[in-house]
Amino acid sequence: MKRKDTLKDYRGKSIDQLQEAKIELLQQLFSLRMQKGTGQLKKNHLFKSAKRDIARINTIISEKNK
């Protein structure tokens, strides 16, 4: 159910808000990479979820631009 809720949330936002959310996710992904490099990261599944959320946002942005 979480995916459907996030999709509804993303679709309700404007393009500018989606761009901001994408930037936040990219920053989160960068911080996860740094934690992995230093050996502090124990939850590797967060990479996959962050990348998928970024892809979802990119898809919605392209849909709204049409």
Swiss-Prot record:
InterPro entries: Ribosomal_protein_uL29, Ribosomal_uL29, Ribosomal_uL29_CS, Ribosomal_uL29_sf. Coiled coil: none annotated. It comes from the Bacteria. Keywords: Ribonucleoprotein, Ribosomal protein. One of its GO terms (biological process) is translation. GO terms for cellular component: cytosolic large ribosomal subunit. Pfam families: Ribosomal_L29 (PF00831). The keyword RNA-binding does not apply. GO terms for molecular function: structural constituent of ribosome. Gene3D superfamilies: 6.10.140.1970. The keyword Ribonucleoprotein applies. Belongs to the universal ribosomal protein uL29 family. This is Large ribosomal subunit protein uL29. It comes from Francisella tularensis subsp. tularensis (strain SCHU S4 / Schu 4).
